[in-house]
Amino acid sequence: YKRQNNINGITTQMQNGFQDGGASIISQNRGAGNIKRALGTFWRLVIIEASLGLIMYIILNIFAGPITYLFANSQDGYNVEFQNMIIKVFRYDSLGGCVPLGINAAVMALLFGFGKTKLTLFCNFCRVFVFRIPILWALQNFTTLGSESVGIVMCLSNILTTILSCIVCLLYTS
């Protein structure tokens, strides 16, 4: 899991930077009474984050072979089975990670910008304890997917977290 998570980190670290900057801009505009501008920043951030996620999803999947080769090649030599496992897990993780986590980062920026940290805590709590651990437990106990189950869990938990955060955002902003 760690290796494919490092690969997806290429995308999510950039998105987290936009999230942090966006939260500051949203907060400043909210504090100045420019709610319309704060919400405009949020929608621009959604477009930037989702676009960045899509571009990086395409690039990372095109170059998955050469990138994972770096992780599958060690002092013991090249391990093609290990590389194939990393690619398989990575493909699931990136599907649920690159674009959905970009959208989620924009939503988190809005919630942080409006001082709604308890709502962000709720969404992130659900990511781990509702969407991740139970699904991983079920896949590992009731299927024969093996390491592939980790990628599926990451994909599902990231998508479900993004859906939840969007619902929370819609309820909060309406």
Residue spans for each PLM region:
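Conserved small/polar residues in nucleotide/adenosyl-binding loops
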Residues: 1-4, 172-173
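Small-residue-rich hydrophobic transmembrane alpha-helices
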Residues: 3-58, 62-64, 101-123
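Residue-level recognition of pore/gate-forming positions within transmembrane alpha-helices
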Residues: 6, 53, 128-129, 158
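Short runs within selected transmembrane alpha-helices of multi-pass transporters and secretion channels
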Residues: 12-19, 93-113, 119-128, 135, ...
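Short alpha-helical transmembrane segments in multi-pass integral membrane proteins
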Residues: 26-97, 140-174
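Alpha-helical transmembrane segments of compact multi-pass small-molecule transporters, enriched
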Residues: 70, 131-132
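Transmembrane alpha-helical segments of integral membrane proteins
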Residues: 132-140
